[in-house]
């Protein structure tokens, strides 16, 4: 059984036991997190939501918080001997799927 869920404006295909990386959530590591925006449940008889499947939820365990690859933002003003270099690392939350309720 699999489900397509929405988290942070993005869609993810999840199965029980899978680990997904979503944008940073305000949840403690080790706590339980419920994704209730389920767009579709597949495997056997498929259920498609309009826009969400009623009564469906995906429960996850928060595995931890990680940072993505570093990107460099460089602004240069030509002929002015002026520039600004700034780095950024996006925060992500890793979720381990523990159950899918249809």
Swiss-Prot record:
Organism of provenance: Solidesulfovibrio magneticus (strain ATCC 700980 / DSM 13731 / RS-1) (Desulfovibrio magneticus)
Taxonomy, superkingdom: Bacteria
InterPro entries named in the record: bL21-like, bL21-like_sf, Ribosomal_bL21
Keyword terms, alphabetized: Ribonucleoprotein, Ribosomal protein, RNA-binding, rRNA-binding
Protein name per UniProt: Large ribosomal subunit protein bL21
GO molecular function terms listed in the Swiss-Prot or TrEMBL record: rRNA binding; structural constituent of ribosome
Pfam families in alphabetical order: Ribosomal_L21p (PF00829)
HAMAP family: Ribosomal_bL21
